[in-house]
Amino acid sequence: DYSYLNRCAVDQKTMDELLFDQNGRSVFKDVCPLVASLISSQLEKNNINPNDVSKFWLHQANGKMIRLIASKVLNKDDFDPSLIPMPIKQFGNLASVGSLFAFNLNNDLNPGDKGVICSFGAGYSVCSIIVEKI
């Protein structure tokens, strides 16, 4: 179970060794709290209440992950679904570009509104940025 890619020469590896394989359940259990913690910490450091964020454009891994991360950040399960645009329903998992794709399709903030763009992926890497429309 590798959670990262290995640099490898094709002539020295079998086809099974060249494949990228993750245990979906463990990724879900590990990544959701990690991403929620990063976003929450970032908002706290910038004195932003999570409930004051107008949109969360998250990596489009799957709907369950997106909803769980948002519910952990917002500390509630009953939030407006428009807070977390999910083009994954129409376009599937777009890998690293998923959060930016969601942002591009749903960039409807008003001046002064804040949002969070967050991507995560292979190797349990996570990055996040807070944006504010001016």
Tell me what each language-model feature is.
Residues 98-134:
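Conserved beta-strand-centric core segments of catalytic alpha/beta enzyme folds
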